[in-house]
Amino acid sequence: MNAILTGQVFYSYQHELLERGSFADIGAHFSGIKPFHKHAGEIALSDDKLFISGDENLQIPLASIEQIYLGFDEAFPRTLVKNFGVFWQPLRLSLSNGNKLYLIIDYNMLGANNQLWFDGLKKLLSD
């Protein structure tokens, strides 16, 4: 695999976000707490696949990504992010199998590299 981008990732499926308790919304605003997520690992982007390894091992063909979205929605609201999303927003992938993945890539307490990954995915998907 010839990686275009690599990084560390926190992620959740849409159903996991919708099933979270109210403590997750409150806990997100404490210093030193990582953003809400159910899974963690490493992520790599090649010219035809997205690879996630960690507590799950996923290989997502880029052809199966129906939509990418950078921002908040009803499943991942601003209340889940410290400073209500001033410094970063989640990256959502809508897949052809009906799953929606919410990614937080290279989080460092101040921000994340989601914009870089959004731009990279957008470029590959438009080619």
Predicted feature locations:
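Intrinsically disordered, low-complexity boundary segments flanking structured domains
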Residues: 1, 56-57, 89-91
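Phosphoinositide-binding peripheral membrane targeting modules
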Residues: 35-86
